[in-house]
Amino acid sequence: MTKIHSESDIPVPVPLSSSERSHAADSTPAPAAAHPPMTTSAPQSTGTSAAKQWLLSVLFPRRCPVCEEIVSPRGALICPDCERQLHFLTEPTCQICGREILAADEELCENCKRHRFLFKRSIALIGYDDVAARSISRIKYTGAREFLDYYGREAVRRRGDELRRMQIDAIVPVPVHPSRQRKRGYNQATVLAEVMGAELGLPVYEAALCRRKKTAASKELNAAERLKNLMSAFYAGPIPQDLRRVLLVDDIFTTGATMESCTRILLAAGVEEVYCFALAIRSER
């Protein structure tokens, strides 16, 4: 099975549009470094990879995941003022699905009191509000995959202790249908998983889960409708026999139906425990 690994004062050229940036990124070989440098100052090293990374940062300056303008200060991954607009989740959260709950003495949200998921636990980075929705939409539909560098690193910075306590063996991204991946040029869950995998030192198994059916848009469906929509949508790919604990990664957690469907497939394939991470989670309906 193939293991997948992730990669990021002089005058600045006029920035390209999202679609032009996406095309340029796709036509440029991925740098060998696992962690893109955090600044755009000229590299001290004469290494080819460092020089190329510096040149790319000059030609294609970072854009903010929230406002989509060139990031200030230069070298950061998000504008400080914009970062304050993101709703980072804080305790108390549901100990199963990861949603914020109001009562500090409660461990589960109302939904998880009624329904127990097959996965052990899910956590998320931010709440799915209008700001998060716009940012994730740009990632999925305008080629702004570089926004996931920020979200993946921030996920490990803020939730890394919890993720490490799960004693994960590998990360598996939730797959999109091949036709959608060809249209976008990437699977946003895979890119997010790659960034997190590099930060955590974990392998990413993209082929462990596959999608055979293009499901209908499900953002307005309830949990039962989503489960029906996802019926037979996924199947298991090659999975190492010694893989015991897996972190399933997706961009949005709504009802948990997608995570539940993927968990069911992984458990049937021999994985012992499945944990989940979502970039954003919707509030309880």
Ranges and model annotations:
Residues 1-250, 254-285:
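Glycine-rich phosphate/pyrophosphate-handling loop used in enzymes and phosphotransfer proteins
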